[in-house]
Amino acid sequence: MAKETFYITTPIYYPSGNLHIGHAYSTVAGDVISRYKRMQGYDVRYLTGTDEHGQKIQEKAQKAGKTELEYLDEMISGIKSLWSKLEISNDDFIRTTEDRHKQVVEKVFERLLKQGDIYLGEYEGWYSVPDETYYTESQLVDPIYENGKIVGGKSPDSGHEVELVKEESYFFNINKYTDRLLEFYDANPDFIQPPSRKNEMINNFIKPGLEDLAVSRTSFDWGVRVPSNPKHVVYVWIDALVNYISALGYLSDDDELFQKYWPADVHLMAKEIVRFHSIIWPILLMALDLPLPKKVFAHGWILMKDGKMSKSKGNVVDPNVLIDRYGLDATRYYLMRELPFGSDGVFTPEAFVERTNYDLANDLGNLVNRTISMINKYFQGELPAYEGPKHELDEDMEALAHETVKHFNESMESFQFSVALSTVWKFISRTNKYIDETTPWVLAKDDSQKDMLGNVMAHLVENIRFAAVLLRPFLTHAPKEIFKQLNINEPELFELESLEQYGALKQPIMVTEKPTPIFPRLDTEAEIAYIKESMQPPKSEESKDEVEEPSKAQIDIKDFDKVEIKAATITDAENVPKSDKLLKIQIDLGLEQRQIVSGIAKFYRPEDIIGKKVAVVTNLKPAKLMGQKSEGMILSAEKDGVLTLVSLPSAIPNGAVIK
């Protein structure tokens, strides 16, 4: 009989720079689910990969003096190396530059075009021919006004004259599927997880009205070309999302994997891209008349004490550093235990070292070491089969073992990894306490208690086996080492099914003669300092003299009072179609929500600014930039042509006036 299938995916990562611990978080979570489902007997297919097209990749390659593929091959080598080091058990790795993917993107685009879901339109903006770039009115140098309107100006990059032009663009008519999408949500209430994300999608995006989506670009050429109109490159919305089916051979000569595994059981992603997976992707699949995935799960961010990870802040955590220094299991355990999946979590060196020392070295490691040492001391390493009386606590321990398995499975099914691990650690802690309560060292002094002592030892070994089996999806080395030191060699005893019966481990039990620590204790102060040092950006070899910009003319306090500046939180951001420099940003001002269009796209990716607390000029007259309404201006600092958002402490409430 064929096994039931389970198809799981991570987002495909954009290889414009080295991956950090946040990327590892998504991929380790997917690996934990995959391993758990395999232990349950599922035929699992686990997909991850890279999103390799777009202007940023083109610019990165040019800056490095390489072709796009040369640059990408180097970056992908590092990504695959990290996944290997993390022992990610993915079954496939999709690159959007592969022919198997590009051919599917071409076919999907042409099909949607033919059936009228994609149409050709125009986008209007200020264009510099030498720069091959569109600019917003606010970006123009020396703007020319007529009757209060800008009618011309110069490029901020080259100084060339700009002209108002219209550019062709293909648009995806997603609004026509709104009612059908809402009906799907109603019929599948668990489709978007956690539930708070569903409310956010409906209230913030669907109810206000979905705008047709620009799905092609002509301002760069690194991407999949539209077959029927090759001057257009397919934009990210279709290119990247299609990977989930192109990797299975959809629309190819061999679609066996697609027929077997689609629809996906779960798409994992960070919360900033849940909108694309819960709105655009379902609509795209509806247009293709394909089944929709069963679930999209948006996990939170790994934050630092001072906000999101940033090289400039010196708080980027490289997973390679943690693995090389502390081992794979300590790294995977921390990610899944400390950070509640579905919510934001804070990484601190202190918590990492504490989890390693207290949970892994003290609780688990010492339990294994103490048990093996006692069996060696009291039974010369071989625990015979005993038929004697049980200790009064033994039935409680057996019941707790089964209860632990039940709660563990419930938590794993809902992807509550930290809760699942907490359940196991409560069991481990109770087992440690069981040693203190049964006092084996006292029983060993009385020959008449030998059978009782044997039963206590047998319960300790069985409890350790239960814990090791449950930890297999999370820890790839420690369970194997535990089984080895306990001399448990039967493969069936490593599986979840073996936990249905307490005492499945048959005696006699022969343990290793000299137990070795599974998790050595860390020097707390030294290792905290080491992690903090590894997070600092490399110091430049030479410090450049800073030249201050000349100040502008002085103003009166009355002039300054005319400007209203308030604190706001960025709740969403996305690129403005056909613009290389603009982001469309949604902000929360406390009593109202606003949209602002800001020229920071060259310095920030949309997902990097969501959640930031910023300063906003709120009494500017509304303007339209590239067809998008803008109701204010987010303050930023400029140095050497680089813009940096002015960030505010999170304690300042939204809407607070800044004076």
Swiss-Prot record:
tRNA-binding domain sequence ranges: 559-659
Subunit annotation: Homodimer.
Motif extent ('KMSKS' region): 308-312
Entry-linked HAMAP family: Met_tRNA_synth_type2 (MF_01228)
Intrachain disulfide bonds: none
GO cellular component term, pick one: cytoplasm
Coiled-coil residues: none
InterPro entries: aa-tRNA-synth_I_CS, Anticodon_Met, M/V/L/I-tRNA-synth_anticd-bd, Met-tRNA-synth_bsu_C, Met-tRNA_synth, Met-tRNA_synth_2, Methionyl/Leucyl_tRNA_Synth, MetRS_core
Protein name, entry field: Methionine--tRNA ligase
Motif extent ('HIGH' region): 13-23
Key words of the record: Aminoacyl-tRNA synthetase, ATP-binding, Cytoplasm, Ligase, Nucleotide-binding, Protein biosynthesis, RNA-binding, tRNA-binding
Organism: Staphylococcus haemolyticus (strain JCSC1435)
tRNA-binding listed as a keyword: yes
Annotated family: Belongs to the class-I aminoacyl-tRNA synthetase family. MetG type 2B subfamily.
Predominant cellular place of this UniProt entry's protein: cytoplasm
GO BP, sorted A to Z: methionyl-tRNA aminoacylation
